[in-house]
């Protein structure tokens, strides 16, 4: 029987990091030494780390910044809002995806750049002729981190879906701006302007109302029923109030927003 290659503690930890965090395959995980696949497997078994199937390894071949949602920032808060409104988390797999209409593809491109996602955005046309774009990636770490902020699988019916109370309050405006870009609108209603955003739970609606109140802006909540699901709409009516909302939402160090909505907002405020 051949003599086993002796590795240092640091080398073993690096192999484990490459395999579990960076999602490298067995060969790539040990390439920095270099050692063979069998040596990598021995180290993984030594520390009781499950060996991935070929399918799992192939899914994780393309890179994504797995730790992105572990560090709060204005941009991170914004992406929580986008994912909370338009994102989907797969129940069984570690897949997260967002589908938007093609005209908003710029937003997906920004997110792809932010999380360093190597998977290209997919453009497609639905059976009804709608042109959409889809971004997706696989990450166990991001799925776990999003759950801490109550962005979970099957969010329409999940009791775990809710307001991200772990988010620093100074990033609330960025989170709400993300929700607005995902499920909100600015429009003329009668002779004045209405700003609105739809959310999936009354808790989120009340919390957003409270946040606006803290910033001297009064908004209302209404209830809509769509396909046996209750939607909670937060809205502000009137040019003066909408001007306050605009000033607050876009007074941020982040440069993330949906350009067409911001431009329409500005045009209606003229």
Descriptions of predicted regions:
Residues 1-270:
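Internal intein/HINT superfamily modules and their associated LAGLIDADG
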């Amino acid at each position: 029987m051949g003599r086993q290659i002796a590795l240092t503690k640091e080398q073993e930890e690096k192999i484990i990091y490459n395999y579990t965090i960076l999602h490298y395959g067995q060969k790539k995980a040990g390439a920095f030494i270099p050692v063979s696949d069998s040596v990598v497997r021995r180290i993984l078994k030594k520390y009781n780390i499950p060996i991935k199937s070929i399918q799992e390894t192939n899914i994780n071949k393309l890179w994504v910044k797995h730790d992105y949602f572990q560090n709060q920032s204005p941009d991170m808060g914004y992406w929580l809002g986008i994912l909370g409104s338009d994102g989907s988390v797969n129940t069984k797999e570690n897949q997260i995806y967002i589908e938007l209409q093609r005209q908003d593809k710029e937003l997906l491109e920004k997110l792809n750049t932010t999380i360093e996602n190597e998977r290209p955005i997919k453009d497609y046309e639905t059976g009804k002729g709608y042109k959409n774009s889809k971004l997706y990636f696989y990450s166990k770490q991001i799925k776990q981190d999003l759950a801490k902020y109550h962005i979970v699988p099957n969010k329409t019916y999940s009791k775990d879906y809710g307001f991200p109370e772990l988010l620093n309050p100074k990033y609330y405006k960025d989170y709400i701006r993300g929700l607005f870009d995902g499920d909100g609108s600015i429009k003329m209603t009668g002779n004045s302007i209405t700003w609105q955003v739809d959310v999936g739970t009354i808790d989120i609606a009340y919390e957003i109302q409270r946040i606006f109140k803290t910033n001297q802006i009064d908004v209302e909540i209404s209830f809509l029923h769509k396909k046996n699901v209750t939607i909670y709409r937060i809205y502000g009516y009137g040019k003066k109030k909408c001007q306050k909302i605009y000033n607050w939402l876009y007074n941020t160090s982040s440069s993330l927003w949906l350009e067409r909505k911001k431009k329409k907002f500005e045009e209606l405020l003229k």
